[in-house]
Amino acid sequence: MTRIISGLAGGRRLRVPPTGTRPTSDRVREALFSALEARIDLEGCAVLDLFAGSGALGLEALSRGAEHVVLVESDAKAAAVIKANIGTVALPGATVRAAPVAAVVSGPSAREYDIVIADPPYAVTDEAVVSILTDLQANKWVGEGTIVVLERSSRSPETVWPQGYEPIKAKNYGEARIELATCYGLDS
């Protein structure tokens, strides 16, 4: 079990998929949202949560005031858990896309997101992560000023962000490393 830390749904317990996911710890989630809230007001934001797992990161954003959250998860069992967790949080504005992240972001987006959170399995290669980051820009999922949060293993090298992203911060929390970057666009 994990829980929503703060906001309208603070304290509500969330289910976690039985296998195949690595939920972000409460400590890391709190640090991540502190770093985000120091840079952007979550109120009214559109958030894209990639490799959503239990949905805890995206639902935390919703609880803290995000207007709309899209949670992308390829595993059908995990997507079902996310749907149940949306019911538990009982806030409007959450949508689940049960599909592979690479397939979703390789197509055009109907909107640019203010925040993108990507927590891929540690086994996902750096090249695959960079490809996803590149597709986010090319297909208009992100725009100038979008903040991108990436969770990776603290044992792996820091991400080499593709053109169009400016790294802001990277910090290790035990086994996890949180990296933040801002999108400045390919035309800058």
Which residue stretches match the model-derived regions?
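Class I S-adenosyl-L-methionine-dependent methyltransferase catalytic core
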Residues: 1-188
